[in-house]
Amino acid sequence: MKSAILVFPGINRERDMARALKLISGHEPAMVWHAETSLPKGTDLVVMPGGFSYGDYLRCGAIAARSPVMDAVRAFAADGGLVLGVCNGFQILCESGLLPGILMRNARLKFICHDVHLRVERSDTPFTRGYNAGQVIRVPVAHGEGNYAADEETIRRLEGEGRVLYRYCSATGEIGDTHNINGAAQSIAGIVNVRGNVLGMMPHPENHVEDIMGCTDGRGLFAGLVAHLERAA
């Protein structure tokens, strides 16, 4: 799997993501500076990592979404290429129009930084094939603006089309306000586009891929991507 990690000013999770991708795919990802106008030849996966691109000025991800490299990302996605946006990357995907909705301030107006539980809603996508439908995984979050919001029609479409892949839940998989850490609509933690090749999610699976972290639940996402691409080759 040949992956490319986009690097914007203020991003700070690119090395975590690179370590996870290399560990699981066996290949060193390329680092692509935001001012580039093309992606490395043969790229299979584009990743937008977490951090605070451009200091989160204007809105989280708003400036990064207008970077030169994003035209290449849009073309890549339109051609069926896999795109993963984590945390600030999710915000950039929404601001760029690759995903619907927006990420707002957390409901309690506080930065959240701890492990959470997610329920995997489907196992038949490139981003979830490493899990079972209904499986509960534990991964970290670290955000102040992860409250997913969209108009009612968009939410209905996301639900009706099965485009919600991850939801905040309890350790046993229950969904509800008690377990919805940031107030996101329908406890949404991760969604895909209509075609299913672009995923945005607030939690950080890349930080739970090694035993030293005390949990390896994030491995399934990356292992599933590798398996999907190997099968498609």
From Swiss-Prot:
Reaction catalyzed: N(2)-formyl-N(1)-(5-phospho-beta-D-ribosyl)glycinamide + L-glutamine + ATP + H2O = 2-formamido-N(1)-(5-O-phospho-beta-D-ribosyl)acetamidine + L-glutamate + ADP + phosphate + H(+); L-glutamine + H2O = L-glutamate + NH4(+)
Recorded GO CC terms: cytoplasm
Key words of the record: ATP-binding, Cytoplasm, Glutamine amidotransferase, Hydrolase, Ligase, Nucleotide-binding, Purine biosynthesis
SUPFAM superfamilies documented for this protein: Class I glutamine amidotransferase-like (SSF52317)
Limits of the Glutamine amidotransferase type-1 domain: 3-233
Listed GO biological process terms: 'de novo' IMP biosynthetic process
Coiled coil location: none
Pathway(s) the chain acts in: Purine metabolism; IMP biosynthesis via de novo pathway; 5-amino-1-(5-phospho-D-ribosyl)imidazole from N(2)-formyl-N(1)-(5-phospho-D-ribosyl)glycinamide: step 1/2
Protein name: Phosphoribosylformylglycinamidine synthase subunit PurQ
Organism whose genome encodes this protein: Nitrobacter hamburgensis (strain DSM 10229 / NCIMB 13809 / X14)
